[in-house]
Amino acid sequence: MSLSRVSVTAVRNLHPVTFSPSPRINILYGANGSGKTSVLEAIHLLGLARSFRSTRLLPVIQYEQLACTVFGQVELAEGGHSALGISRDRQGEFQIRIDGQNARSAAQLAEILPLQLINPDSFRLLEGAPKIRRQFLDWGVFHVEPRFMATWQRLQKALRQRNSWLRHGTLDAVSQAVWDRELCQASAEIDEYRRAYIKALKPVFEQTLSELVELEGLTLSYYRGWDKDRELSAVLAGSVQRDQQMGHTQAGPQRADLRLRLGAHNAADILSRGQQKLVVCALRIAQGHLVSQARRGQCIYLVDDLPSELDESHRRALCRLLEDLRCQVFITCVDHELLREGWQTETPVALFHVEQGRITQTHDHRE
């Protein structure tokens, strides 16, 4: 799938704009502060109903404007198209529209418009809290395992019930046993989906990484959130007192993690920022390959400031891998000349100049 038209109103410093991107490579260039990243943020908002620059959406709304809106027309892999729209006002009200109908949740947007983000904060996937890596993992499982979302909702409901009981003791023993069984069953299913996904992801990640950088001894492993040699039911039964003291459940899928190690060390402690960026790129490109294998369509990649922390050879290698995905890519940079030689002649490349919040399409930079 790809975006054939994007309309943005009142997002940060962007003037109202409608533009038609290339179905393949789109390069947005301009000075720092011109609004390039805000274009990616608008697309991210359209696909995920949230910003990647702020946990709060209020700063996204342009000063003195009541709401921000983003519309997009998505060309579907199976043919035809879908119209998406999202609006957010200063009171925090969201409206999501899909083909003229109100949508129930942001998950419906994500299913139609799967997005991958690579930006200067990408190193947080390695250095940040386990929650960030769980989000990465579950994004991938969501897009390849149709049963995941329903199971995830069951898990969250059971987990809320148990945590409420731990804090307030509001359930009788019989009811609590029922919810514990549901929690354990849903946890086992989530663990199964995640384990299968990592098994598929690892060889694709390793191959992709080898085409970007040589990092001998780098390993990717999965921790499910409780002792691999014990049943979750036994772990929960043995930790009730501790869980009550903490006020929440200490073991389960909500504690899962991905572990990247270089020899005996955490990869984040050893690798340079440039190497970390390449590892994260390999992970996200590998996810894109799995999405395309599981469904008739590809991810859309948002790559903010691609040249930063990468030398020419690594920039070229990354561009070639993105190109080989045969998907739509939006890339920002200050100087588009740094990406001049990154693409094959037959690959469609659209060039957009962003200046003081205005977007102007210019000629293909290879002409």
From Swiss-Prot:
Tell me the InterPro entries matching this sequence. DNA-binding_RecF (IPR001238), DNA-binding_RecF_CS (IPR018078), P-loop_NTPase (IPR027417), RecF/RecN/SMC_N (IPR003395), RecF_2 (IPR042174)
Task: Give me the segments passing through the membrane.
Answer: none
Chief localization class?
cytoplasm
Q: Which GO terms describe its cellular component?
A: cytoplasm
Q: Which GO terms describe its biological process?
A: DNA replication; DNA synthesis involved in DNA repair; double-strand break repair; SOS response
A Pfam family per the record: SMC_N
Localization annotation? Cytoplasm
One GO molecular function term? single-stranded DNA binding
Positions binding ATP in this chain are: G30, A31, N32, G33, S34, G35, K36, T37
Which keywords appear in this protein's UniProt record, sorted alphabetically? ATP-binding, Cytoplasm, DNA damage, DNA repair, DNA replication, DNA-binding, Nucleotide-binding, SOS response
Which PROSITE patterns does this entry report, sorted A to Z?
RECF_1, RECF_2
Q: Which HAMAP family match?
A: RecF (MF_00365)
As for what it does, the entry says: The RecF protein is involved in DNA metabolism; it is required for DNA replication and normal SOS inducibility. RecF binds preferentially to single-stranded, linear DNA. It also seems to bind ATP.
Q: Which family does it belong to?
A: Belongs to the RecF family.
Q: What is this protein called?
A: DNA replication and repair protein RecF
Protein source organism: Pseudomonas fluorescens (strain Pf0-1)
> What is this organism's lineage?
Bacteria, Pseudomonadati, Pseudomonadota, Gammaproteobacteria, Pseudomonadales
State the gene name recorded for this protein.
recF
